[in-house]
């Protein structure tokens, strides 16, 4: 009997493999082919282009165990996680797919056979739903499978519009769609809930375990449903739900995976009660966070990284709630890898960087908590009334990671009410912003769709005859264009490389007698290559034969930069470690940009070693060899793949000696020696855990070196030396500058001491306390602290407020002697003054600083200080 989650996963894939399905690896959680998705959230995502007819595979049946995330965007389960039996941010979707192969009867039979024969689920515990008008599905279930009519439930348009139904699936407002049938499991009458379609259907008794979608229509913009020429099937079964059934439990959080993670989290934090909901949250969130980082997402303040950061902080908050006093979340990664089995292969390979990224985010969260307490204290001190507004509460939560319930606890101690409704409004607005982050809601159907194929000859030639098969003007198909028209021209065959894998599209010309079309870019449109540009002369029509000519110089320079990215990737892995993987690239004729995973800045010595290693491989003049092979064979040979790229079962492998082997469909030099020279121009971080190197090659590298030499010679002339003496002379100048700065600081201290002696006489006495309020002219902000200390020593029991203006800004300092801080706090005092000069600030009870942007209001602000102090000393 299959019981563990790992056993169920293997059994499912083996069942469909034995029934003629290609087992396809789970795709990345970062969708590689769909701009409308924030994260991969269903098994069919990686096959979307196949269903749309824009991609072809060498198989018509497939099966997967797809990793999915639902957090942020349209599909967001985050708020419910930990509080229900079945909501998760991360889950695995088991699925089988037919691309114009089998249809309803086979799909239904496969599902029923796996559940009742392979898993041996009792048939009397199962019932099914179908779309209201899908009589064909009813006949199959009833007559061919043998399900009683009373156990086949018809579901109509229960969402308020035509075809808006739990049992009618639609990819979007237009495009492939169709009815679906769902299989439900009855957990028993001791669990509350009703059959699907009943008023009690939201209960936990009847649980959907398998959804089988029949894609048989193409919905038009008019709403008309046209039959698809090749109907297809998309199915999905959540592994956590079927595991709960097989393991005899009623909550997903009681299955083997979660039991292990919950127990480990409790052990690390020191919790004895394993039923704590916070432990569920932590166990769920470590799965989504770890796998997202493994797939290249890093915590940040925008897009996918923003959602990841929120999930991490939610988990850490629940850990703190349970009493965690130090970073704990990252310590769950080894247990996660162990319990996920084969599904954690990619995670195991990136374990080091995943743990470092999680730990860094946890530690940063701890620092923001401390800052949040300081911000909250200042906000409460400035509060007028008894209610802290929701926007401030949300700012503390969202910007500083400060939990709302902790804010409420602090407020209760001061008899202050928290505006929870305002907080929820601000939270809802931020959720909307997160959904829109990175424009992930773009209309997929807005892309130009071209029903054609173009053969590529550009690996071996840069010019050749071709026939025009289609022309698109302003997004519409036309038969001809005239001079001056900007259009996309499709050919039956082309030497032009279409942008892919970081390499920009080729430029060049399409020419014939009296015709010249300037190609400014080349892009892929499904299986077709689109030549984007302007018709300079003549007229061009579909069916004409032209000569396609790639710009040789631009292609050559691009190839230098592309080939060297392979060498750079291999060199980085040698120097920094095998955790380095490519996260993106840009290769054009002028330069290259290479993004890679690494948890810290690359040291100067490491950069030098990388550069030297690449240039060594260039000098060795390796021949670049390409070969077509199966994806599994390529992986066995150690070929590295590009982050976010999709690969067919047959791939192209590029090898450079024994130094580099990668999957790549781009164009390259013949030998590494053609690159000439490689020079790194910059290295920087672009996100947490992601670094970027920019570099140049060939003639551009020589020009860069020449420019550096010219700048060095110019610097030498300014220092009155030569290139060989620049460093020594510069060091001497810096030493001299440091000495002058030291002397200047000493002089300022003397001036401050002298000024303090003069200022003592300006103090007034209020109820036996020396009070000094002064606007200072010509005093730098950096001198205020020392001056305040001098005055405190001379005035003893005193309250001091000093202000100065410099470059259109106000600088303030307040000092209160220790015997008076029970009555007057420097932080409150300086904040009061700062508010009147367009600024803010705070600090300790005995000393605080602030700034402002309205120097014209400084005199009036200082005039308010004495009454303010007098009131508190009364």
From Swiss-Prot:
The lineage of its organism: Bacteria, Pseudomonadati, Pseudomonadota, Gammaproteobacteria, Alteromonadales. This is Alanine--tRNA ligase. It comes from Shewanella baltica (strain OS185). Its EC number is 6.1.1.7. CDD domains: AlaRS_core (cd00673). Its cofactor is Zn(2+). Keywords: Aminoacyl-tRNA synthetase, ATP-binding, Cytoplasm, Ligase, Metal-binding, Nucleotide-binding, Protein biosynthesis, RNA-binding, tRNA-binding, Zinc. GO terms for cellular component: cytosol. Zn(2+) binds at residues 562, 566, 664, 668. Consists of three domains; the N-terminal catalytic domain, the editing domain and the C-terminal C-Ala domain. The editing domain removes incorrectly charged amino acids, while the C-Ala domain, along with tRNA(Ala), serves as a bridge to cooperatively bring together the editing and aminoacylation centers thus stimulating deacylation of misacylated tRNAs. It catalyses: tRNA(Ala) + L-alanine + ATP = L-alanyl-tRNA(Ala) + AMP + diphosphate.
């Amino acid at each position: 009997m299959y019981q563990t989650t790992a056993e169920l996963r293997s059994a499912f894939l083996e069942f469909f493999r034995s029934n003629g399905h290609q087992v396809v690896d789970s795709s990345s959680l970062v969708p590689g082919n769909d701009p409308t998705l924030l994260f991969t959230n269903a098994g069919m995502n990686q096959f979307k282009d196949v269903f749309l007819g824009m991609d072809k595979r060498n198989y018509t049946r497939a099966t997967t165990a797809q990793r999915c995330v639902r957090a942020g965007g349209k599909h967001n389960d985050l708020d419910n996680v930990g509080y229900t039996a079945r909501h998760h941010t991360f889950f695995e979707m088991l699925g089988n797919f037919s691309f114009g192969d089998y249809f309803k009867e086979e799909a239904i039979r496969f599902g029923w056979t796996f559940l009742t024969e392979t898993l041996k689920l009792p048939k009397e515990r199962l019932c099914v739903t179908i779309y209201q008008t899908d009589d064909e599905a009813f006949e199959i279930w009833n007559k061919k499978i043998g399900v009683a009519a009373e156990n086949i439930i018809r579901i109509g348009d229960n969402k308020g519009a035509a075809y808006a139904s739990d049992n009618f699936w639609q990819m979007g407002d237009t495009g492939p769609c169709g009815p679906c049938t769902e299989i439900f499991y009855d957990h028993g009458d001791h669990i509350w809930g009703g059959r699907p379609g009943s008023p009690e259907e939201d209960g936990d008794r009847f649980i959907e375990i398998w959804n089988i979608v029949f894609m048989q229509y193409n919905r038009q913009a008019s709403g008309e449903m046209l039959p698809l020429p090749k109907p297809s099937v998309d199915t999905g079964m959540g592994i956590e739900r079927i595991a709960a059934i097989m393991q005899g439990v009623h909550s997903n959080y009681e299955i083997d995976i979660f039991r292990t993670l919950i127990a480990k989290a409790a052990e690390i934090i020191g919790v004895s009660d394993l039923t704590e909901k916070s432990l569920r949250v932590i166990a769920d969130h470590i799965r989504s966070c770890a796998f997202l980082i493994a797939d290249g997402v890093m915590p940040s303040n925008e897009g996918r990284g923003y959602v990841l950061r929120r999930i991490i902080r939610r988990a850490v908050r629940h850990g703190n709630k349970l009493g965690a006093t130090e970073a704990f979340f990252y310590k769950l990664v080894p247990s996660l890898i162990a319990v996920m089995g084969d599904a954690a292969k990619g995670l195991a390979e990136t374990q080091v960087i995943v743990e470092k990224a999680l730990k860094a985010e946890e530690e940063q969260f701890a620092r923001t908590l401390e800052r949040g307490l300081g911000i909250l204290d200042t906000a409460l001190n400035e509060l007028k009334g008894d209610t802290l507004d929701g926007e401030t509460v949300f700012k503390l939560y969202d910007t500083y990671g400060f939990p709302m319930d902790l804010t409420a606890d602090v407020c209760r101690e001061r008899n202050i009410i928290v505006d929870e409704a305002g907080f929820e409004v601000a939270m809802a607005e931020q959720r909307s912003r997160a959904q829109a982050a990175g424009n992930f809601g773009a209309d997929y159907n807005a892309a130009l769709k071209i029903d054609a194929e173009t053969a590529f000859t550009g690996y071996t030639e840069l010019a050749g005859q071709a026939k025009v098969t289609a022309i698109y003007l302003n997004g519409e198909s036309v038969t001809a264009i005239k001079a001056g028209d900007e259009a996309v021209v499709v050919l039956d065959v082309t030497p032009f490389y279409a942008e892919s894998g970081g390499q920009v599209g080729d430029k060049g010309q399409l020419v014939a007698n009296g015709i010249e079309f300037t190609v400014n870019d080349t892009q892929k449109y499904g299986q077709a290559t689109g030549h984007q540009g302007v018709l300079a002369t003549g007229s061009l029509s579909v069916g004409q034969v032209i000569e396609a000519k790639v710009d040789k110089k631009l292609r050559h320079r691009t190839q230098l930069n592309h080939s060297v990215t392979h060498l750079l990737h291999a060199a980085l892995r040698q120097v920094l470690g095998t955790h380095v993987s490519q996260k993106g690239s840009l290769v054009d004729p002028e330069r290259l940009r290479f993004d890679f995973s690494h948890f810290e800045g690359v040291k100067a010595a490491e950069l030098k070693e990388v550069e030297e290693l690449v240039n060594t491989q260039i000098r060795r003049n390796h021949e670049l060899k390409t070969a077509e092979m199966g994806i599994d064979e390529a992986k066995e040979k150690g070929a590295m793949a590009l982050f976010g790229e999709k690969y067919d079962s047959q791939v192209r492998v590029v090898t450079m000696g024994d130094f580099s082997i990668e999957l790549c469909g781009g164009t390259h030099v013949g030998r590494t020696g053609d690159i000439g020279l490689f020079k790194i121009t910059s290295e920087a971080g672009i996100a947490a855990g992601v670094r970027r190197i920019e570099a140049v090659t060939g003639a551009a590298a020589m020009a860069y070196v020449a420019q550096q030499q010219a700048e060095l010679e110019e610097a030498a002339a300014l220092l009155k030396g030569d290139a060989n003496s620049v460093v020594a002379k510069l060091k001497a100048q810096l030493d001299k500058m440091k000495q002058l700065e030291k002397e200047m600081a000493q002089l300022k201290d003397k001036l401050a001491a002298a000024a303090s002696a003069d200022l003592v006489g300006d103090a007034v006495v209020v109820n036996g306390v020396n009070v000094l309020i002064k606007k200072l002219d010509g005093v730098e902000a950096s001198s205020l602290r020392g001056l305040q200390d001098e005055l405190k020593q001379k005035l003893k029991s005193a309250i001091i407020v000093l202000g100065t203006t410099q470059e259109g800004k106000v600088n303030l300092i307040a000092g209160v002697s220790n015997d008076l801080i029970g009555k007057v706090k420097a932080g409150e005092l300086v904040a009061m003054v700062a508010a009147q000069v367009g600024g803010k600030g705070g600090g300790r009870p005995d000393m605080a600083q602030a700034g402002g942007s309205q120097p014209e209001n400084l005199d009036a602000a200082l005039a308010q200080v004495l009454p303010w102090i007098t009131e508190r000393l009364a």
